[in-house]
């Protein structure tokens, strides 16, 4: 399976880079993982609603440019569907079973994802109703993908 993790903005924190590198290394035994970073829009702190939409639209265009038509897209969003690790593992397994060999997980910037990206998404997922930095969510996502592969192969892993 080919998994792309598309994020807005460049990851700067060393500790997050190290964690993500560790999980992508572990995942290499199960899938080909590609990290794609698209540039974020520079924006002042206090934006109008119209400016926020414009920022999300520009970032969304960059995201969509990285997704091929045959890719199954899963957007990370607060209002996405919450799952247990076991449910997430089952869904990844079903995607592989039904021939979905390309999956892209999309993590938006600080303002979230554009409507166009959400419309392109085949599915949404939420890890919590809480708000987290999008850079941290990339690490959490990598860990959960790795956990899903371990679950699907009945291999031991932390509970």
Swiss-Prot record:
Chain residues that bind S-adenosyl-L-methionine: 76, 108, 127-132
GO cellular component, one term: cytoplasm
GO molecular function list: rRNA (pseudouridine-N3-)-methyltransferase activity
Domain of life: Bacteria
Magnesium listed as a keyword: no
Reaction equation(s) it catalyzes: pseudouridine(1915) in 23S rRNA + S-adenosyl-L-methionine = N(3)-methylpseudouridine(1915) in 23S rRNA + S-adenosyl-L-homocysteine + H(+)
First-level EC class: transferase
HAMAP family in the cross-refs: 23SrRNA_methyltr_H
Quaternary context: Homodimer.
Protein name in the entry: Ribosomal RNA large subunit methyltransferase H
Originating species: Exiguobacterium sp. (strain ATCC BAA-1283 / AT1b)
Lineage of source species: Bacteria, Bacillati, Bacillota, Bacilli, Bacillales
Originating gene: rlmH
């Amino acid at each position: 399976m080919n998994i792309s993790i598309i994020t807005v903005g460049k990851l700067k924190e060393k500790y997050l880079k190290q964690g993500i590198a560790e999980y992508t290394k572990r995942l290499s035994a199960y899938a080909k993982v590609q990290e794609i970073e698209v540039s974020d829009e520079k924006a002042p702190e206090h934006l109008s609603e119209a400016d926020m939409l414009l920022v999300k639209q520009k970032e969304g265009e960059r995201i969509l440019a990285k997704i091929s038509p045959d890719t199954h897209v899963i957007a990370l969003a607060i209002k996405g569907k919450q799952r247990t690790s076991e449910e997430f593992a089952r869904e990844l397994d079903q995607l592989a079973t039904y021939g979905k060999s390309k999956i892209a997980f999309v993590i938006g910037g600080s303002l979230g994802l554009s409507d166009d990206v959400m419309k392109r998404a085949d599915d949404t997922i939420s890890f919590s109703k809480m708000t987290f930095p999008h850079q941290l969510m990339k690490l959490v996502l990598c860990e959960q993908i790795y956990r899903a592969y371990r679950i699907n192969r009945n291999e031991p892993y932390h509970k």
